[in-house]
Amino acid sequence: MIDAARRSQGLRKERTLASPRFADGVFRNASGATPGLRRGSTGGVLRDFLRGGSRRFPSSPLPSVSPLAGWSRRVDAPLRATWLGHSTVLLELGGARVLTDPVWSNRASPVGFAGPRRFQPVPVALDALPALDAILVSHDHYDHLDRDAICALARRGTPICTSLGVGAHL
């Protein structure tokens, strides 16, 4: 596990160390929040994962429509959401465009040869995205924080919004 305080500098480090959620080098959930599976419930999930066979992958490509035509004009509705795969959604809210958890890599992994693979490609190239007002990164798992995608988007100058601990990676 990465010590967020060690990776942080300046004001971010001060805020990390002062956070009531930060202790012993890691951020902790508030009392009562118990992430993960309940005791005794993991056996079936693990068995399905290891022996699931064809049930683990779609039998054919999922239907997909290019979002490019819709993005060429601003939305009239108060909200439009375009799902781009797993955790990545382009939200259009009151004229602003916010991209959540941009993942464009083929695998959710720190290396390109291992880790869970996409069922199908992202429906649009990263450089074909419209101008963005903000990027929201919810947390630092590989299926939500794709380093290559974030670096490419950061070069556009779009603000990246995330929590204190995740900001240390950026």
Segment roles from a protein language model:
Residues 1-128:
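Metallo-beta-lactamase
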Residues 87, 141, 166:
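A generic "binding-loop/recognition-motif" signal
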Residues 108, 145, 170:
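Glycine/Thr-rich phosphate-binding loops of Rossmann-like dinucleotide-binding domains
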Residues 113-162:
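Active-site metal-binding motif and surrounding structural segment of the metallo-beta-lactamase
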Residues 163-169:
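Short, polar loop motifs at secondary-structure junctions
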